[in-house]
Curated annotation (Swiss-Prot):
The gene is xylZ. Residues 104-204 form the FAD-binding FR-type domain. This is Toluate 1,2-dioxygenase electron transfer component. Residues 99-336 are annotated as: Ferredoxin-reductase. Its EC number is 1.18.1.3. It comes from Pseudomonas putida (Arthrobacter siderocapsulatus).
Amino acid sequence: MTHKVATDFEDGVTRFIDANTGETVADAAYRQGINLPLDCRDGACGACKCFAESGRYSLGEEYIEDALSEAEAEQGYVLTCQMRAESDCVIRVPAASDVCKTQQAGYQAAISNVRQLSESTIALSIKSASLNQLAFLPGQYVNLQVPGSDQTRAYSFSSLQKDGEVSFLIRKLPGGLMSSFLTSLAKVGDSVSLAGPLGAFYLREIKRPLLLLAGGTGLAPFTAMLEKIAEQGGEHPLHLIYGVTHDHDLVEMDKLEAFAARIPNFSYSACVASPDSAYPQKGYVTQYIEPKQLNGGEVDIYLCGPPPMVEAVSQYIRAQGIQPANFYYEKFAASA
């Protein structure tokens, strides 16, 4: 039996390792050409110390206190030369990917679907046999090369990978390089290059209630996360607040409704900032955060949106006098 171990490097690159039962993560990594920091291999030096974000694993008792203290082990630190995965895991590696003789993976795919969801948003799906090998954590992104140019644009996955196909939500920008291609030139079958996955914004192990805050096409990583949660189930409540500027920016509402039907503890709301909106809930995301959703601080908050939204939410939470258990955020600025 094998388990997937995601290695999240400090430069944002993520690579996946297949670890066999009883095999140390370090041995599995080196077997697959990923040279994690390592020295003694005996649990004596601490050179391979990483942080386990999630997953079940064993460390054995053969390492020494100087290499990994009891307090560090309780916090989630591991020695990869001793760590044996007992489920899929995620570890943070305190080194850049190039130092570990690896880099972001590259793929070729073809457009399988492209459609304009509204005057401001485009849905893009790409597919290829090689994408069956693409593994990523829900919430991460890739760099897509704009066909016919040497320019790339970063987009979060809006779906999980299924049968070699992945999807994205893309904001349409007047005169934008990718926007112009997708609206005027793109057709099914066109070739697309991508590299990744990248990013430290991804779904962690769910240990408490979640509050998900999306701004505009910042909804994309959350639909991928919700797809994963729908697959694996969970007992903790989660609420999504989706904020946009104009009515036409509201997209994928049918998908959110479908998730609400599939995930027992999931609820969502949406709001539109424009005072001219016909949508029932007007205003900003912070106006629709309820005290019960903050759960006295026993909550993990995920936020993806433009920088002003991230700052506004941060200020709001501070004003409530609450320190959430975890606050993960991804700022994005649309690129032309």
